[in-house]
Amino acid sequence: MYQHIVVLTGAGISAESGLRTFRDQDGLWEEHHIEDVATPEGYAKDAELVERFYNSRWEQLHCGTVMPNAAHLALAKLEAEFSGQLLVVTQNIDDLHERAGSRRLLHMHGELSKGRCPRSRQTFLLREPFGVNNGCTCCIPAQRLRPHVVWFGEMPLGMDRIHDALDNCDLFIAIGTSGTVYPAAGFVDTANHHGAQTVEVNLQSPDRHSQFQYHLTGRAGELVPKLVDTILAGRVIGSDLAE
């Protein structure tokens, strides 16, 4: 039976809830140059453009139709019922994991629902989109809050905590990730090095160079609940469940 699980989630899990992804063919990068909306330099050049870009995602997330799907709910169930240690690391900046009930959660790329003071680095929960009362309350004069999002060229958040968890886990699961963007792409190597079982859940069939031991190909909303049930039943993931 597993004692220490690390789960990594990427854009694929949120796409099943109706959120557009950054890197798909019809995704947001098609409408903007990356350097204009997702770099510190782009923000320094045109903060209003960057705010509009993230406001469009904020509004989509709060439109009333985007909700956690079965995969989000299954991971929240795993947290509630699993007797061992669990850490869910997400590359997503939405709050669908939180809405599903997950609390043992780390947003390595930041959170769309928060702004950050550029001077103190204190974060603030956003009740409204950027541009509406978006000054900090920690400085005099108040500083303009920037999106609490990790941009290209910036260090992902919580890396020490993530690596500590990977060093000690006996099961690593990646759900809906491309597996091509570092440092997250290297998490499977770390887990394998420390003897963990590694499982990938993805819509696409695995690359022949994949380092994962097991692959589940299909929708996260269908496969993750089955995976969670297997874990909670005290069974080891095997070829009967994975490819």
Curated annotation (Swiss-Prot):
Pfam family, one: SIR2
A GO CC term attached to the entry: cytoplasm
Entry keyword Transferase: yes
Binding site for Zn(2+): C117, C136
Cofactors demanded by this protein: Zn(2+)
Annotated positions binding NAD(+): 10-29, 91-94, 176-178, 202-204, 220
Top-level division of the source organism's lineage: Bacteria
Catalytic activity, as annotated: N(6)-acetyl-L-lysyl-[protein] + NAD(+) + H2O = 2''-O-acetyl-ADP-D-ribose + nicotinamide + L-lysyl-[protein]; N(6)-succinyl-L-lysyl-[protein] + NAD(+) + H2O = 2''-O-succinyl-ADP-D-ribose + nicotinamide + L-lysyl-[protein]
Active site: H109 (proton acceptor)
InterPro entries linked: DHS-like_NAD/FAD-binding_dom, NAD-dep_sirtuin_deacylases, Sirtuin, Sirtuin_cat_small_dom_sf, Sirtuin_class_III, Ssirtuin_cat_dom
Keyword Metal-binding set for record: yes
Record's keyword terms, sorted: Cytoplasm, Metal-binding, NAD, Transferase, Zinc
Record localization: Cytoplasm
Chain ranges of the Deacetylase sirtuin-type domain: 1-234
UniProt-recorded Gene Ontology molecular function terms: histone deacetylase activity, NAD-dependent; NAD+ binding; protein-malonyllysine demalonylase activity; protein-succinyllysine desuccinylase activity; zinc ion binding
Binding site for substrate: Y54, R57
Entry EC number(s): 2.3.1.286
Note: This protein might be subject to alternative promoter usage and might also encode a protein with a 7 or 13 residue-longer N-terminus.
Role: NAD-dependent lysine deacetylase and desuccinylase that specifically removes acetyl and succinyl groups on target proteins. Modulates the activities of several proteins which are inactive in their acylated form.
HAMAP family: Sirtuin_ClassIII
Domain notes: 2 residues (Tyr-54 and Arg-57) present in a large hydrophobic pocket are probably involved in substrate specificity. They are important for desuccinylation activity, but dispensable for deacetylation activity.
NCBIfam families associated with the record: PRK00481.1-5
UniProt similarity note: Belongs to the sirtuin family. Class III subfamily.
Name the UniProt record assigns to this protein: NAD-dependent protein deacylase
Gene: cobB
